[in-house]
Amino acid sequence: MIVAAGTKNPNKIKAVKDAYRLFGFPAEVVPVGRPAGTPPQPVGLEEVVKGAVARAKAALEAVPGAEHGVGVEAGAVHAGGAHLDITVAAIADRGGAVTLGFGPAFQIPTAFLPDVLKGVELGELAERYFKKPSVGYREGIIGVLTGRRVTRYQLNLAAVAMALVPRLPKNAKLYRT
């Protein structure tokens, strides 16, 4: 199965490949860059979901032989009086169906919050503060905050795995529309 991933980030590409493998789908993942017009740091759940869906659909269109397009997007959401960074995955197929999955969310450091809410990428802020270049392509800010006990790859993997749940053959009847 050919899967187009709307990213060039090795973390996200590995998460897509491993999530498909987890459920027994042998996937050849073809990376495609982020579509134009997608903000680097979406704010609000609708914007994060919209970004993941846009990535998935654009990736699917960019790779003619792909069965699925996958978009993974992280962004800031407000819930329970806190601002959280959440990862959302969207999987689009040639029939027009889109399935969604969310990964674990963590509270955004208050020191970074004003800039994040203005649209500055959380990874960029972490790189500057922690003096770690390309942190988003490695462990992510969550990896820095947790001493690598939890990494960005794990958040991405969880989100893609959850987006695959409705696509599992054993669940076909449950999710039929």
Curated annotation (Swiss-Prot):
Quickly give the catalysed reaction. Answer: XTP + H2O = XDP + phosphate + H(+); ITP + H2O = IDP + phosphate + H(+)
**Does the record bear Cell wall biogenesis/degradation in its keywords?**
no
Q: Does the keyword Transit peptide apply?
A: no
| EC top class, as a word | hydrolase
InterPro entries in alphabetical order: ITPase-like_fam (IPR029001), Non_canon_purine_NTPase (IPR002786), NTPase/PRRC1 (IPR026533), YjjX_NTPase (IPR050299)
A GO molecular function held by the record: ITPase activity
Tell me which UniProt keywords the record has, alphabetically: Hydrolase, Magnesium, Manganese, Metal-binding, Nucleotide metabolism, Nucleotide-binding
Which terms under GO biological process does the entry name? nucleotide metabolic process; thiamine metabolic process
List required co-factors: Mg(2+); Mn(2+)
Q: How is the cofactor bound?
A: Binds 1 divalent metal cation per subunit; can use either Mg(2+) or Mn(2+).
Q: Known EC number(s)?
A: 3.6.1.73
Q: Can you tell me which family this protein belongs to? A: Belongs to the YjjX NTPase family.
Q: Which PANTHER family match?
A: NON-CANONICAL PURINE NTP PHOSPHATASE_PRRC1 DOMAIN-CONTAINING PROTEIN, PTHR34699
Describe its function. Answer: Phosphatase that hydrolyzes non-canonical purine nucleotides such as XTP and ITP to their respective diphosphate derivatives. Probably excludes non-canonical purines from DNA/RNA precursor pool, thus preventing their incorporation into DNA/RNA and avoiding chromosomal lesions.
Q: What quaternary structure, including any partners, is listed in this protein's UniProt entry?
A: Homodimer.
This one is known as Probable inosine/xanthosine triphosphatase
Instruction: Please name the source species.
Output: Pyrobaculum arsenaticum (strain DSM 13514 / JCM 11321 / PZ6)
Organism phylogeny: Archaea, Thermoproteota, Thermoprotei, Thermoproteales, Thermoproteaceae
